Amino acid sequence: QLKSKNFYKKKHSKSILECKIRDWKPYDLQYWESYGISLPWLKFGEVYPISHTFITKDNKRYTFRAEKYAYAYVERKDGIVTLKIYQPKSTIRKWSNSGNASVWDLWCQLPKTGDKLFITSSRKDALCLWENTLIPAISMQGEGYIPKQSVIDELKSRFKNIYIFFDNDFDKDENHGRQYAQFLSKTFDIPYIEIPNEYKAKDPSDFVNKYGREKLKQLINELI
């Protein structure tokens, strides 16, 4: 039987998503470090390595062995645990999610007030930016989501300068990341920034993977 401290679950619709946490391995830390995120920040961001996922539906429980690189993102909106399972190298199921559009990644970790804040497209990018610039960062469930006006108003009351920092899909026929960023920027009167095309890196974590932490710090200073 799984111990509760190593076991998270969240009811979602008619199914329940659960996972079992395992110990961190050297290859896990190497993977995350390559994107500018260290173990202390993984712990801060409630990112956990996992060995199994479980789905209960119609009173039947299904067990799935997680891939080698498999992680759970935990969020605690209003005291309710939600899970997002991330398998970055999977060709079958990269994501599983028990949350909904109202759940923001890293919301619980935000300081009460601050000078600057990034709104990114993923927890990975948010943690990368936060660790390497010490500027708080959060993310929605994806770039295509539209936040509530009340949530944006709260963020504006807490942070003096907010920046939308979505993907620059420079290598796609349509740059959806830029389109979403421009839409939110216009809708909520928040400036947006992106990785310049010349770097051929779509987001902050990919940028660190290609150019390193120090180069990211330099770029952010130029962009804001």
Show the residue positions of the predicted features.
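Residue-level marker of alpha-helix boundaries and capping positions
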Residues: E18-I21, K116-L117, D171
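TOPRIM fold recognition
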Residues: G114-D115, K124-I224
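Compositionally biased, low-complexity repeat tracts
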Residues: W24, W41, G45, I55, ...
